[in-house]
Each structure stands twice: as C-alpha cells, then as structure tokens.
Amino acid sequence: REKRPDAVILVGTPTWSQEIDKAAESPLEDKNVMYTLHFYAGTHKDDLRNRLESYAQNGLPIFVSEFGMCDASGNGANDFESTTKWLDLLNKYQISFMCWNLANKDESSSVFRANSTKISDWTEEDLSEAGQWIKAYFKNRSYQ
C-alpha cells in the first residue's frame, strides 16, 4: 500500500474462489479490494449464480478472475447456454471477468486448437469451439 495506495488488490476466496460469502462475512478493511470468483458454466449453475447476485446486489466488490464454458475439470462439453446466463448476470452488475484459458492444450477450455502454434495473427481456424464462441460474444456485444 505504501507504493501504490490506489492499486486494486484481488483477494481469492475459499473453495477455488467460490465462497464469496466468506468475504462478505468478514471483509478486509481496505478501500480497493475486490473478491475473486471462479466458475465453470458446465458445472456451476443457478446456486452459484444466485449467490453471486445476492452479494453483488449488496455491494460486495467482485471480479471473476477465471471462468470456463465447460465443466470444472477444464474439459468436457461446453455449455454455452449456461455461459450466456453467467455473462448476462456479470454484465448486469458490471462485474469484470477473464476467460480460462489462453492455451492450445487439447481441452475444451482452451481458446486455441491443439494444433495451433502461432503466438499472434490468429485466424478462425486457430480457435477452438470455446475460442470461436468467446470471440463472437465480444464481437457482437454492444459497448456503452
């Protein structure tokens, strides 16, 4: 805090950053703290969404520092319907989020296909199913 008093500090929460209720019960005494939440749309559904909404409505500063469109293993089928519900909720409360994972590992959570070896100038063919979906999501979103 001495060097950067206005810097935001992201604080993880228990159980893979899903228990934001623990942060709400005993928040840190600092003006620039946000509590992290992780979700995987194929696994985490209404229960975690409802918990997030409850604490967001009460002003808990939340940042989704990891989310995937598949199940919590990082692999398995993508659930784009659940992903859409999640992102709609995050946008409703202006909660920032980061997609997992920017990799070419042969898993459904990877944004790139396993055979993509580029480090820039990616094409649609370099993107996995998840990568194509998230690209289309941001491309088609209206920004205010």
Which role fits each region the language model picked out?
Residues 1-96, 100, 109-143:
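Extracellular glycoside hydrolase catalytic/binding regions
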